[in-house]
Amino acid sequence: MHYAPIIIHMHVNTHFHFFLGDTHYRNQFETSKSSGALSHSARTGWEDRMFDRKHHNATGFERVKYGTMNFVNDPKGVRACAGYGQSYFLLKPHVRDRCTITDMDSSSPSATLGTFRFIFHLLMKLSDAEVNSAF
């Protein structure tokens, strides 16, 4: 787990140009673009539920940015996230300390939260099939 990177999957042909002229990774509230659900109200509901409404009135820049933890260091990234793009950015290791991690898609009402330093309760929820499918 010590080397598990946080990555951001993306479609190079449609999203890479957003990264070229910017100094920050922007969320859909800032760009109005998404490879997932684009509904602001749906995403606001998920984030309100996950974070007890702490981001409800936040500016777009202050809102959640989404990525995934490549806990098995698969060179193809996280296979369950391939729908967001086959390519990905590898974030610097110190970013992990500022991340909230879920055991499943964050839109799920039953998603459990953790952090990189407090993650074992999430790993214990993985089935053998989920772990094996990562290899």
Describe every region a protein language model picked out:
Residues H2-V12, N27-A58, P75, G85-F135:
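Active-site-proximal loop/hinge segments that shape catalytic or ion-binding/gating pockets
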Residues I7, H17-F19:
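Long, low-complexity, Ser/Thr/Gly/Pro-rich intrinsically disordered segments that act as flexible linkers
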Residues F19-G21, K76-A80, T100-T102:
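A short acidic (Asp/Glu
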Residues L20, A37, A42, G60-E62, ...:
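Residue-level signal for the start and early helices of compact helical domains
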Residues H56-A82:
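Extended catalytic/binding region for NAD+/ADP-ribose chemistry, centered on the ART fold
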